[in-house]
């Protein structure tokens, strides 16, 4: 129960620009290995012009193989699903840990939202050189967002996630450290 252990022993709460928690060592070594080995296209090899969204992995026809109104999207992220969970036993255990009553009760209390009937969606994303997201608010239907970094190449900590205040002023960058991350809840 690495995530819960991290939450209990290696996490810190911050209130600016909104309540969020940073976690140190939330992933197991096996989970990290599966993330690193996930089959995800390298966006650098496709000369992509990022538009500030994640739509590149299916939205724009010019990035598809085949015809622009169909074809097969390039795979720049990988959702862990019932269909592929056998390929990701360690990440499946992370999902099970997040679904565990002790874990979701603890997070529910922290973010002040009932997670007992929520759905856990885990995805492996591959943000590479040139990637950026427009400042945005998560949709209210998303009860909680969590991003856990794997940085085995010692890339700059400045490549983490930027947080903005309500005036869209940059107030913080969560550092891009190996086996480090954050979570927060959107809206009231």
Feature map (PLM): residue ranges:
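Non-heme Fe(II)/2-oxoglutarate
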Residues: 3, 9-110
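Short alpha-helical segments and helix-capping/turn motifs at coil-helix boundaries
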Residues: 5-7, 131-132
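Catalytic core of non-heme Fe(II) oxygenases with the double-stranded beta-helix
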Residues: 87-188
């Amino acid at each position: 129960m690495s995530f819960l252990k991290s939450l209990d022993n290696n996490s810190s709460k911050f209130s600016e620009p909104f309540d969020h928690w940073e976690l140190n060592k939330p992933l197991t070594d096996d989970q990290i290995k599966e993330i690193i080995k996930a089959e995800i296209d390298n966006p650098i090899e496709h000369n992509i012009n990022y538009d500030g969204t994640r739509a590149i992995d299916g939205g724009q026809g010019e990035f598809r193989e085949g015809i622009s109104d169909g074809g097969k999207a390039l795979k720049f992220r990988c959702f862990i699903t019932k269909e592929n969970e056998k390929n990701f036993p360690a990440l499946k255990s992370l999902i099970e840990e997040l679904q565990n009553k002790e874990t979701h009760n603890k997070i529910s209390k922290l973010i002040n939202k009932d997670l007992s009937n929520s759905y856990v969606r885990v995805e492996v994303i591959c943000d590479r050189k040139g990637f950026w997201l427009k400042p945005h608010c998560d949709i209210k239907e998303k009860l909680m967002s969590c991003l856990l970094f794997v940085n085995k190449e010692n890339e700059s900590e400045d490549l983490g996630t930027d947080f903005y205040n309500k005036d869209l002023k940059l107030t913080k960058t969560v550092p891009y450290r190996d086996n480090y991350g954050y979570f927060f809840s959107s809206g009231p």
